[in-house]
């Protein structure tokens, strides 16, 4: 009888290597865990608060009121003829979604190190759940915005392009991916450089004032500043959002090309850094 030769098989459990780290099928298998993280985020965010989830609407309304006073009444910045409350609420809601993606995703490794060190699951599930949480908040705020939009539509003060609503869906998706890319880049770097968390908060605020959030792009006439605004990846989404729902805004193919290129590059860089850091971050956090 021939001797059976046994081969040694080594089974490795842990994160995949390099670009194979982004396994969409694996993430789909962990979809229940992702939703569990989403629920956890909401529970933690509104735990022991008097108004609870009502803060989802209160925060943008307070910001909108402040912008109406500061930029509309005192600074008297143009809103391209649009009602101030609609103009600022639109910018606040969309930018709030983007900034929450960056700020919350940037703490992925530092705030979840205890979970990561105890059990294996696709680490990318954590930042994705954060983006989904931000998206849910945005949708609630968008519902409020849409109700106000219908009020001003009945008055004849806005002219939405209803045929472009599908573009709005793609626009929000692109903003989420851009925020995810920026966030995971920062989260990967903060495993070694904790100071970045402080810098990011200031940087995101500075980025907001460098984007057409509280003012329209039409206000920027200086050639150099205009060029900077064009390559800003958040300019195209902001102006397109207003163009779809207000009928105003300056959008060009160059703006969208720049925005999509930046989104792709930052997301690719973020995923690459994330896949490298997740293997060793426990030793550095």
Feature roles, as predicted:
Residues 1-285:
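Hydrophobic transmembrane alpha-helices and immediately adjacent juxtamembrane helices
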């Amino acid at each position: 009888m021939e001797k059976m030769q046994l081969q040694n098989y080594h089974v490795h459990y842990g994160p995949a290597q390099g670009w194979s780290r982004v396994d969409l099928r694996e993430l789909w298998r962990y979809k229940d865990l992702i939703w569990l993280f989403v629920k956890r985020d909401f529970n933690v965010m509104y735990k022991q608060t008097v108004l609870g989830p009502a803060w989802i609407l209160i925060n943008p309304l307070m910001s909108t009121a402040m912008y109406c006073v500061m930029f509309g009444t005192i600074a008297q910045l143009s809103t391209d003829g649009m009602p101030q409350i609609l103009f600022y609420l639109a910018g606040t809601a969309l930018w709030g979604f983007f900034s929450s993606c960056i700020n919350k995703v940037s703490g992925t490794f530092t705030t979840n190190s205890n979970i990561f060190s105890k059990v294996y699951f696709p680490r990318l599930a954590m930042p994705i759940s954060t983006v989904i949480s931000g998206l849910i908040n945005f949708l609630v705020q968008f519902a409020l915005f849409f109700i106000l939009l219908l009020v001003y539509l009945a008055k004849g003060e806005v002219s939405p392009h209803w045929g472009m609503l599908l573009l709005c869906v793609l626009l929000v998706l692109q903003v989420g991916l851009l925020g995810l890319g920026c966030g995971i880049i920062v989260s990967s770097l903060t495993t070694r450089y904790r100071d970045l968390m402080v810098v990011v908060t200031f940087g995101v605020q500075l980025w907001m004032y460098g984007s057409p959030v509280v003012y329209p792009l039409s206000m920027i006439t200086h050639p150099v500043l205009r060029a900077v605004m064009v390559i800003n990846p958040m300019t195209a989404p902001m102006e397109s959002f207003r163009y779809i729902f207000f009928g105003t805004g300056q959008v060009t193919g160059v703006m969208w090309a720049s925005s999509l290129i930046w989104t792709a590059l930052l997301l690719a860089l973020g995923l690459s850094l994330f896949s490298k850091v997740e293997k060793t971050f426990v030793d550095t956090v």
